[in-house]
Amino acid sequence: MKNQIIKKIILYIISIFLILCLIGVYFNKEGFIGNDGETDGEKDGKKDNKPANNEDPAYRDRLFTDLKANIGEFDIIHNEQSEYQKIEVIQFKKNSLGYDKCLLLNNEPQLCNNDEKEYHEIIVHFPAYYISKLEKVLIIGGGDCMCLREIMKYPSIKQVDMLELDKSVISVSKKFFNTDAYENDPRVNIIIGDATKQILKLKENEYDFVIIDTTEDGAINLPIDEFDFYKTCKKMLKKNGVMIKNGDRTLNILSISKLFKNIEVIDLADIAVIGEYKFILGSDTIDFKKTALKNKELPKLKLKKYDYKNHKKHFLM
């Protein structure tokens, strides 16, 4: 009897050991999230500095094949290698979806001129809904200047600081998409350079709203998607401020949820070129699902895609 009990105990211990080994292998492969909000796997990836999948020629071939299949034939009307990335503009030939020009960075579609408002109106006006008086805004990225365009629709704006890594994105967007960088507007300050360094020169507790509108793939964006950078962005906000980040990667959601008392993931309608898209919203003082419209200027704006009356439809249930 005692021998049977001992055997069962030994088998139980061996089973526990094997389970722990399997868990260890899993987290070693997938990456374990530590106190800094990063996975070990992502840290190792940064050290390796391997190119992201979208920089692989095979990825480019698949992307172009999909674009032609889903939308139609196109020409590459602009192609340049800036100091940081490949910048391309493609122009579709006549198609049933009405697509014209699209901007690609390192083989990743960023926007198309016929549906970009679907993205830019949500990333700007959805959070602005919660800000009673929008005066000071910080934009991280946003080199196409389309977030800037939407922000400048608010008469209350006093200051917009935009941190953009690549000045070539601004010039290409101006040339092919007729965007405005507001160079002659004293309220707008565009700072070219590494956002992780430039942001340290700005005042803390200064902004009503922080927008992170950066590319989501490629080595140049790795420092932006770090917990410490999100932490710095939060320091820029006033007490009742709001931050929004494009994309919904699990790591980003976990990092931002560590920083803010309230977070929500909001949904964007499916767009043919970039597909289904989401944003992460964060605040310490605003319960996004329970708070009513605060911004009295928002209902007066002429918008094409975002309707404040249907605000709640964008929440993920």
Residue ranges of predicted features:
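Intrinsically disordered, compositionally biased terminal peptides
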Residues: 1-53, 207
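Conserved S-adenosyl-L-methionine
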Residues: 262-271
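Short, solvent-exposed loop/turn segments that connect beta-strands within catalytic domains
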Residues: 94-99
